[in-house]
Regions:
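Membrane-water interface of transmembrane alpha-helices in multipass transporters/channels
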Residues: 1-10
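Divalent-cation
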Residues: 14, 19-22, 26-226
Length: 226
């Protein structure tokens, strides 16, 4: 029993060390969800910022679609994308269509990378995304689409893509690509995906469940927990 108890203690400690970044992120999310539940004004501000980010993104993508300017915009959700943001330049600015068009202007320094949206703000630009490893993707998809799909495979982010070749607007979610979107369809999709519909209590309960699964899962299940 003495040996078994020590083995279990060491195993629990190893899990905590192994999943330390994920645990810290989940605890931060739990704290912020409690803060919003006690501060309705903060939640209202966040929703307003996200709605502005969506409307400005749709406006910018509509114009850049006409000029066939390549676009890659990542909307962060529950999973923090700090590692991805660090591959680019931290901006942390209010979202506007003009700012987005300046970033993706073909001669701009950050135009080849992705923009990261966080809590309704333009958090980073010029970021590098992981390419999809799906061998069944259509051959007509370029690097920008493969990067967008790859980002959605590796996180819960919503990724907006504008093709440089055709001007087509697409959205990648969960490894799936929705193509040929009209501006009004894009706006409706982003609102549905990014504006929380469930009460904060339900969101907090989901985070508790994720934290419990994270602490009790084995190392081999790490991909499913993220």
């Amino acid at each position: 029993n003495f040996i078994l108890s020590h083995v279990l203690s060491l195993g629990a400690l190893a899990l905590i060390v192994l999943f330390q970044p994920e645990i810290r992120r989940l605890l931060d999310q739990l704290g912020s969800s409690r803060l919003r539940s006690f501060n309705p004004f903060a939640r209202t501000q966040q929703v307003t910022a996200i709605e502005n980010a969506i409307s400005q993104t749709v406006l910018a993508c509509t114009e850049m679609s006409k000029s066939r300017t390549g676009v890659l915009i990542v909307f962060e959700r529950e999973m923090a994308l700090d590692d991805v943001a660090r591959t680019g330049t931290i901006v942390d600015a209010r979202v506007s269509s003009e700012l987005l068009k300046n970033i993706f202007f073909v001669k701009a320094a950050m135009h080849d990378g992705a923009v990261i949206m966080r809590d309704g703000r333009l958090y980073a630009g010029g970021c590098m995304l992981p390419l999809s490893k799906n061998v069944n993707l259509s051959r007509d998809l370029g690097m920008r689409h493969r990067a967008g799909i790859g980002m959605s495979e590796n996180s819960d982010a919503v990724v907006v893509i504008v093709s440089e070749e055709t001007g087509t607007i697409s959205v990648a979610i969960g490894g799936l690509l929705k193509r040929h979107l009209m501006p009004e369809t894009l706006e409706k999709l982003l609102l549905n995906e990014l504006i929380p519909q469930a009460p904060d209590e339900q969101r907090e309960e989901k985070l508790h469940v994720r934290l419990w699964r994270l602490l009790t899962a084995g190392k081999g299940d790490k991909h499913d927990e993220i």
